[in-house]
Every structure is written in C-alpha cells, then in structure tokens.
C-alpha cells in the first residue's frame, strides 16, 4: 500500500495500521466501509473476523498473543467491492505524517442507469472509541434517487451515529462539523467515480 497525499511517501504494509487498534489509522474507516475481514493465524490455525469485531476498544484489537496469533491478511469480499467506487477524506492539521483529526470513507454502488443509490456505506475514524459505520446515514440514501438533497440529508444523518470526543486536536463540535462536511464530499466524489451525475 502506498499513500498519496495522506501522509509520507514511504511504502508500508497494512497490518501495522490495523493491529495497533487506534481509531485514527488511515485504513480503519476504509476497511470498515468495505466490510473487510481480518485473517489471524496462530498455533491453532486460522480464524477470520469481520473488521467491525476486530476492534474491541480504543487501542485494543482481538489478537490472541498467547496463542502466537498474528494478522496475516485483510480480505475484502467481492460482493463488497464489485461495481462499487469509493472516496476517503482525512482531515488533519498538517498534510504529512499526521494523525487524523477525522477520517471519513464512503463507497457507493449505483443502479444500472446511475440514477439511484443501490448501496452506500460510510465509516469514520476518530468519531468514537473505535472505527465505526453510520447506518442511519446509509439508510437515508439506500434505494433513493441520486440528488443533492439526498446527499445533504445523508451527511446530516451521520450525527445520529457518531460520538467524537473533545481533545487538544479538535473539539467535539468541530469534529462533528468536519464529519458532516466530509460525508457530503466523499459521497459526491464516490458518485462521480461511479459514473453518476449530480
């Protein structure tokens, strides 16, 4: 995996970004939006966890170190990515080597005529103690026409699901504002990538 505009120009593997369990990891929200599976391998073989179950609490993931488990793969099911386009926005104080103040990932599958939201998924980093989806926002647009009015309603609905914190990086109110704005921008860009017209 190589970042472009998200951080530094170093090449890296994705496991370190997930195994540390922090909600601010750049890959965390995107892997949640794509409904990824985590493959864990240990002395007793392999097991697979949905990414939403992998993150237990802030800074803690479900790896059994006593059994020598390590993360060996991230899998994204074909049904999650087929005919689907997505976009990620990271908000931080700097352009490089920065921990996200908020990270938002949206992906969309449009109807064949590109006029209806067939499926929309949105996930956040730094909107709660673990990366999280915003199912209320998803429900607002799934099955609905691709319109700016629906995109605006989608972006406002994220506030029903997220619970950002106050910190020295940003206040809860500011993080909430960024979450709404990034939801809107991510969905607009995802629609464009999927061939939709606004």
Across the structure, where does each feature detected by a protein language model lie?
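C-terminal structural segment of proteins
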Residues: 4-198
């Amino acid at each position: 995996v190589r970042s472009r505009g998200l951080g530094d120009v170093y090449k890296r593997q994705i496991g370190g970004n997930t195994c540390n369990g922090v909600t601010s990891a750049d890959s965390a929200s995107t892997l949640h939006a794509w409904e990824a599976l985590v493959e864990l391998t240990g002395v007793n073989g392999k097991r697979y966890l949905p990414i939403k179950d992998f993150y237990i609490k802030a800074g803690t993931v479900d790896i059994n170190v006593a059994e020598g488990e390590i993360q060996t793969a991230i899998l994204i099911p074909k049904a999650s990515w087929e005919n689907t386009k997505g976009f990620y926005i990271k908000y931080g104080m700097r352009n490089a080597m920065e921990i996200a103040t908020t990270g938002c990932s949206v992906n969309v599958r449009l109807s064949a005529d590109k006029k209806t939201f067939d499926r929309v998924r949105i996930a956040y980093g730094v909107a709660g103690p673990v990366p999280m989806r915003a199912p209320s926002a998803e429900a607002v647009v799934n099955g609905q026409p691709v319109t700016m009015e629906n995109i605006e309603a989608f972006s406002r609905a994220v506030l029903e699901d997220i619970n950002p914190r106050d910190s020295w990086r940003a206040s809860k109110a500011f993080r909430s504002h960024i979450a709404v704005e990034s939801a809107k921008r991510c969905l607009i860009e995802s629609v464009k990538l999927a061939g939709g017209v606004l």
